[in-house]
A protein has these predicted regions:
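Active-site loop/helix belt of alpha/beta enzymes
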Residues: 13, 26-43, 96-109, 114-228
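A charged N-terminal "starter" segment
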Residues: 1-89
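Ordered, amphipathic secondary-structure segments that act as subunit-interaction surfaces
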Residues: 91-93
Length: 231
């Protein structure tokens, strides 16, 4: 109930026409994707993100065949059958992954992640140039990136990444775009594009108006002491 309420609160902040997905990586941040996934699906989530293919396999078993499941790590060695057999979509993060994907899963859908300035995952401008012919053939179903400093709303990197993402994505065939995770949603409509990807905010981990914590830490006090100053 709490996680669903947080998702709805974040979805309500999206600009009109923007889809709100849900990030369930690391077993829904340790809360159990097998429980959180079906709950969010019933609330209306149509697109889920996980970190690894094995997480996607487990989530597919929990939520059924219809919602899209995208894997943020992309296509790793030995994962081709998992993607094909469980209808998972890799987020391709490098020119190598693009080449490997085209060979391993020809005709299969993919997404592509761009490095707009965080320097963690994604193709930078040079890699995009090298991979552009293959990506033009593949026609990714989603183009995404991630903000490095969205937790600091007035950080100049946010606007710089917004411009860089728009420029890089504009070189690809037309496709829906996604830049904002939870903190990006809170930056405002310019960052929302076609799809937002709240993760930690679903669980109350990043405070916003209307947010509710999904977990509460409580513990007994075992012992107290009086300590003199300087002791």
């Amino acid at each position: 109930e709490v996680i669903t309420a947080n998702w709805r609160a974040l979805a309500a902040r999206g600009r009109p026409g923007t889809e709100t997905a849900a990030v369930l990586k690391a077993d829904a941040y340790g809360l159990g994707a097998d429980r959180v996934g079906p709950t969010l699906r019933a609330a209306g989530v149509r697109t889920f993100f996980v970190a690894l293919a094995e997480e996607g396999v487990a989530l597919r078993a929990a939520i059924g065949p219809d919602p899209a499941i995208l894997v943020l790590a992309g296509l790793l060695p030995g994962d081709s059958e998992a993607f094909r057999d469980h209808d998972l979509v890799p987020c391709l993060n490098s020119a190598f992954q693009v080449i490997d994907f085209e060979k391993s899963l020809p005709g299969y859908p993919c997404a592509v992640q761009l490095d707009s300035g965080m320097h963690r995952l994604g193709l930078d401008a040079a890699e995009l140039e090298a991979a552009l012919p293959a990506l033009t053939r593949l026609r990714p179903r989603l183009v995404l990136s991630h903000l490095a400093c969205a937790d600091t709303p007035d950080h100049p990197a946010n606007a710089a990444q917004l411009r860089a993402f728009a420029s890089l994505a504009g070189r690809l065939p037309p496709a829906p775009r996604s830049l904002a995770a939870t903190a990006g949603i809170l930056l405002g409509a310019d960052y929302h594009f076609d799809l937002t990807r709240p993760g930690i905010g679903l669980y109350g981990g990043l405070p916003f108006a209307g947010a509710r914590p999904a977990v509460v830490l409580s513990l007994p006090v075992i012992q107290t002491r009086d300590v003199a100053p300087g002791a």
